[in-house]
Amino acid sequence: MYYNVINAWAFWYLFHSFQDPLPWSVCPLNGNHTGYDEECEKASSTQYFWYRKTLNISPSLQENGGVQWEPALCLLLAWLVVYLCILRGTESTGKVVYFTASLPYCVLIIYLIRGLTLHGATNGLMYMFTPKMEQLANPKAWVNAATQIFFSLGLGFGSLIAFASYNEPSNNCQKHAIIVSLINSFTSIFASIVTFSIYGFKATFNYENCLKKVSLLLTNTFDLEDGFLTASNLEQVKGYLASAYPSKYSEVFPHIKNCSLESELDTAVQGTGLAFIVYTEAIKNMEVSQLWSVLYFFMLLMLGIGSMLGNTAAILTPLTDSKIISSHLPKEAISGLVCLVNCAIGMVFTMEAGNYWFDIFNDYAATLSLLLIVLVETIAVCYVYGLRRFESDLKAMTGRAVSWYWKVMWAGVSPLLIVSLFVFYLSDYILTGTLKYQAWDASQGQLVTKDYPAYALAVIGLLVASSTMCIPLVALGTFVLHHLKRGDAAPVA
């Protein structure tokens, strides 16, 4: 429902990537053409393009605003592409997946070669591979890690089950599960190296640019010798100037920024900000920036479409397999209705407050529910269906007995780990207290923290409840119907 809006944003940035210069590389002029836009100057050109030109974001969640027609058209295009890819079911989806899965690797290899040659790339890689052991005690870190692996492997979404339903009975699912897991882990590390090499370049560029501005300001103000100030003696010189010329230093002090490479590396942006702010910040400073921008957002679009094919397959497979629905509607009509309904609901995320609603769905619709779904699946297979029956089925499929390792992991380790993550999630929720969100303040040119309004908290509660209660409610309904049928079938004395 909400994931395809990322593809809409990718389309928007891809279309603007052919402009020279890139529209997020410079701030626009103000209304009087006497200077740059005030909001852009206080923030940055990349933040301004994201929050103002792309989202046209409202100051708070309470101010929904209207639907923005440009993102809405991009969202419509994104759903049209998804519909064309799933039009003929797995026959067309399979061919598209080969392209959407392989092309990003080519782009990542190109970006890896370019990223490792950028100035400051090693700073990003050192930051990536430097462990922070204190984070192991943070429950949210474990929950985020589990959510990420669920998303990347598609666990709990139903897409794997939907695709697996088309396999031959003799398919060696054990071998494929191992291969997919290894490829996923390799891809995550590979993509992280690419990301942090670019991130290191961006942080180093901003750090050195900050040093140049501060050095120029101090050199001009105190008539210092050109080239006297360096990164190694800057703090020492600042201390001397503050003590020797206190009144003069106090005048320029508000304009002296604290330049630190560590702080630049620590100001990590998550989620959509990483894709549409951090990367664009780095791309705009590269040579032939239009080329790198087109490659990046085309890769992002391919990854997004590939993910959407799996998500829609999880919805369409049970609908098309249902005799009641498929007897009245052809497969193309079912696919079209699913895309149309989701596109209509997704228009909420193209409003001025749409990004706030997107964050709500992203944070609360598929976190706790994923843990519960995977836990129920594990318990259902191991303890309801029976581990021995499941082992017998796998032996019939693969021709080999299942190792003790897998049985221990399925029946013992996996449920315990999932329950632990469930406890971590609840403890983090309790420790967080009042739920808050990040809102864009145009007057300051930065994000500010605000409390969720009451109706937003109600929506969050509804999302969590609806996504977690579907399994027990359906189980209860099935149980009641089963007993009603047994009662009707009983002989009358």
Regions found by a protein language model. Name each.
Residues Y3-W24, E38-E41, Y105-M128, T195-K202, ...:
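Hydrophobic alpha-helical segments and their helix-loop junctions in multi-pass secondary transporters
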Residues I315-H328, A353-D359, I379-Y405, D488:
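Alpha-helical transmembrane segments
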Residues L73-L84, T100-C106, I110, I183-F190, ...:
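Lipid-exposed faces of alpha-helical membrane segments in multi-pass integral membrane proteins
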Residues N4, E41, S45-L55, Q62-L87, ...:
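Hydrophobic, membrane-embedded alpha-helices of multi-pass small-molecule transporters
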Residues M347-F349, D359-C382, V402-A493:
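A generic transmembrane alpha-helix motif of multi-pass inner-membrane proteins
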Residues T90, G94-G310, L316-M347, M351-D363:
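Membrane-embedded translocation segments of transport machinery
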Residues I6-L80, L84, T90, T122-V143, ...:
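Inter-helical loop and helix-membrane interface segments of multi-pass membrane transporters/permeases
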